[in-house]
Amino acid sequence: MIVLDTHALLWMDRDDPALGAASRRLIEDAWRAGQVAVSAISFWETAMLVQRGRIVLPLPTTEWRSELLQAGLREIVMEGRIGILATQLENMHRDPADRFIIATALQNQATLVTADENVLAWPSELLRQDARL
């Protein structure tokens, strides 16, 4: 399974060239197997970006989310184990959304697709793919 960071989700949805060829292939292969997921916090993050006028979606956020889920994207809800794990990520910056997304990937033994330099450089057992590659 792969977990998309919020920006990777947006890049995938928009067919943004910022999403690298290797990551695109990884996502496409995982999509066919029904193994592409996001943390529920990514929908919160996206809604906040829309509300602040930093991005525009083709649909209202609720409908956009529904379409992605109907197309096969898996949403992993934030449960207690993920919340606790998010507090235990040593040497990770304090951004709670990043912590929840990382904890979601770790809890599900998934590869996180991200372009976040801090996450990519973080020394840990987290499996990760640079979304730009």
Q: What are the residue ranges of the model-derived segments?
A:
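Phosphate/NTP-binding elements of NTP-utilizing enzymes
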Residues: 46
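Short, well-structured N-terminal submotif of metal-dependent ribonuclease cores
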Residues: 1-38, 52-66, 70, 117, ...
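Active-site neighborhoods of divalent-metal-dependent phosphate/nucleic-acid chemistry enzymes
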Residues: 56-58, 62, 69-118, 124, ...
